[in-house]
Amino acid sequence: MAEGEITTFSALTERFNLPPGNYKKPKLLYCSNGGHFLRILPDGTVDGTRDRSDQHIQLQLSAESAGEVYIKGTETGQYLAMDTDGLLYGSQTPNEECLFLERLEENHYNTYTSKKHAEKNWFVGLKKNGSCKRGPRTHYGQKAILFLPLPVSSD
């Protein structure tokens, strides 16, 4: 290889015949603020619970493209979404309100910013009591927006 040449590699999904973004196992999103797991309930309510055995905390993260993810409750089949007021809810179908920008922070936690409201920097967040924090009330540096993706235990 001559100096200055660039070698490119085919996408791993093509090379290993993996489905794009849907090969991950379900995860739990543990919030640094109050120790709650993000939960999507059958009625579309989004909140947090400390009950690790709750089936509604199992979430499937699937990549739309690099750094962009859909978050779907495996039990309810609903997608995490943020409306125009910054409220989190469960949506039956994926739409532009369901797409989030996933970012790995220096402290190894992840943050999820609404792609639709990216210019406003609205994050997914949970208060210490487990209720949702509205997008306009979130900002970088808060513990409420820090989530640690954990594997679902096989107990």
From Swiss-Prot:
The modification N-acetylalanine is found at A2. Belongs to the heparin-binding growth factors family. Heparin binds at N33. SUPFAM superfamilies: Cytokine. It is found in: Secreted; Cytoplasm; Cytoplasm, Cell cortex; Cytoplasm, Cytosol. This is Fibroblast growth factor 1. InterPro entries: Fibroblast_GF_fam (IPR002209), IL1/FGF (IPR008996). GO terms for molecular function: fibroblast growth factor receptor binding; growth factor activity; heparin binding; integrin binding; S100 protein binding.
